[in-house]
Design a protein with these regions (language model features):
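A conserved glycine-rich beta-strand in the N-terminal activation segment of trypsin-fold
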Residues: 11-22, 29-48, 54, 72-75, ...
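Active-site region of chymotrypsin-like
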Residues: 27-29, 93-101, 126-182, 190-195, ...
Length: 310
């Protein structure tokens, strides 16, 4: 039996009110972040005195301000940033502000309605509704950052919403909304944010591994794969070796083709970067190398990627 028009109206009104209530629950903890030209981004009061936002929206390290729910604009200091997970942490001093209720992205299901919430200096609170379009397991970004869960959202991400909270139907913050590749919208899950925030507050940075090599993808001809009995179609060819860097000290040469790291095949530079997470710094990695048409093994002691400006 089909629903009557009045029943459908009542259902839609109830859904609309519930979503508005979800926005209202987080609204007082959402701030506008002024750290780039023209359009501000958003952030959320994650814990006492700590604002979390997207690193990609932080275009300067000084003269940062945030606009609160009551309209006040106050200074904020950059406590730390991690481009690999797209998380930046700002600190506030002597500011009373409600803390958002933090949930878990693991509670989400494909098809669940979610809301990207933000704040701008001009229009105040704003939101965009969408649905969870894809979920997955843990993954590494192209810069080596470990993300605990893959969460893709189908919604319109206006510039003022970037870096703001993604909330579920209960108004709980389940992640930070960021721009993904090819105009996708992703959420950095709350578990990842908690881990990154704790490390940034303690150390101001997160170590990332590097091997001091400039590389680019290369395709291997079938004849060579057959001769060397290789399963992979390609690897990464070394086009630059940083003097006295980890690769140089291990004896890697320009023209070497890296085929695998610790037994895991690599086919592009993103594969290599993704395997050099914080846990790799200071540890050796076994690299299968093709040199002069022959295979050899090289052990590289992974170094720490220099910070920006170093």
């Amino acid at each position: 039996m089909s629903s009557s028009p009045s029943e459908m109206t009542s259902t839609l009104l109830a859904l609309s009110n519930n979503l508005a209530d979800a926005v209202e629950r987080v609204a007082s903890a959402v701030v506008a972040v002024n750290a780039r030209q023209r359009i501000p981004s958003s952030g959320v009061h994650w814990q006492s005195g700590v604002i979390v936002t997207a690193d990609e929206t932080i275009k300067r390290s000084e003269d940062i301000t945030v606009t609160l729910n009551d309209g006040r604009t106050v200074p904020a200091t950059l406590a730390g940033r991690d481009p690999s997970t797209d998380i930046a942490v700002l600190k506030l001093s002597d500011v009373e502000l409600p803390v958002a209720q933090i949930g878990e992205a693991t509670s989400l299901k494909v098809g669940h309605l979610v809301l990207a919430v933000g704040r701008s200096d001009e229009s105040g609170l704003n939101a965009s509704m969408g649905a969870v379009s894809a979920l997955g397991g843990s993954w590494r970004s192209s810069y080596g950052g470990l993300i605990d869960q893959f969460v893709r959202i189908d919604l319109t991400l206006y510039p003022s919403l970037e870096g703001g909270p993604l909330v579920d139907a209960m108004g709980r913050v389940v992640g930070i909304t960021v721009s993904g590749p090819r105009r996708t919208v992703l959420a950095i899950p709350a578990t990842t944010v908690n881990r990154v925030v704790a490390q940034l507050l303690e150390k101001g940075r997160i170590a990332r591994g590097y091997i001091g090599l400039g590389m680019q993808p290369v395709h291997l001809p079938d004849s060579l794969k057959s001769t060397l009995t290789l399963n992979s179609n390609g690897g990464v060819i070394v086009v630059n070796v940083e003097p006295n860097g980890p690769g140089d000290r291990a004896g890697v040469l320009i023209g070497d083709v890296l085929l695998s790291l610790d037994g895991t095949p690599v086919s592009d530079t993103g594969d290599v970067q993704a395997m050099l997470g914080p846990e790799c710094v200071g540890t050796p990695v076994s690299v299968q190398v093709m040199r002069g048409g022959a295979l050899t093994e090289v052990e590289i002691l992974v170094g720490e990627r220099p910070r920006r400006g170093e």
